[in-house]
Amino acid sequence: TILFSLLIVLTFITGCKSDKQLTDYVNPFLGTATLWEPEDLGYVRKMKARTWGAEVFPGASLPNAMVQLSPVTQFHSGSGYQYEDTVIYGFTHTNKGHWNLCHIPLLPVTGTVTPSDYCSHYNHDNESAHPGYYQVFLERYGVNAELTSTLRCAFHKYTFKPEDDKKLVADMTRSNNRVKEWGIQKVDDHTFSGFQDGEGKMYFYAVSNYKVKDIEQVKDDKHEVSVVDFDESKGKEPLEL
């Protein structure tokens, strides 16, 4: 009787086994919101400045990886991403959470670029993330951005409207550290590279499925950015780096 009961229990447990992986229960957005209310903070705020949250990022990363690919909604704001913000300035490649880093910001754009005003609005209804993957729709440019990464590489996939030109803004003067020196150049038809020096040099080497036409330095009276312009020969295919 005991053996029969045990078999019934084991059969029941096996039948209830979930097909989900443990990573299916992970929400990368947890901890990305800033704490404002006294009951959350544990004290009453006496100034209007932004307070602290968990300072984590929702982007794509593997454990102990050299690359963490994540959106920046505001520079010099902990991890660079704050859930309550409404714009994205770029997707950066280094992020340990809490503070600093956020190197090599890239943002897919179309049309004429204004260096001091190129960020895009986004909506959380059109944003998603799970371990190793991040996606968001950039409303200003009509671009769907998808990001993932390996231990040492980042992978970008940008789906533009078929009729739009394809460009990237590389905001090389910005990171969460002060950038003292930077550089970016075309290497060959499908490759560009560069570096940022902000408390240590960070180098990158980017390979594209589209041909790189040129890299232009664009500046106004407030800011300067690099604009990578791509050849349109592939037409409707997403831009991939």
Q: How would you describe each model-predicted region?
A:
Residues 4-11:
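Bacterial N-terminal signal peptides
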Residues 18-241:
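Accessory carbohydrate-recognition regions in carbohydrate-active enzymes
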Residues 14-15:
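C-terminal motif of bacterial Sec signal peptides marking the signal peptidase cleavage site
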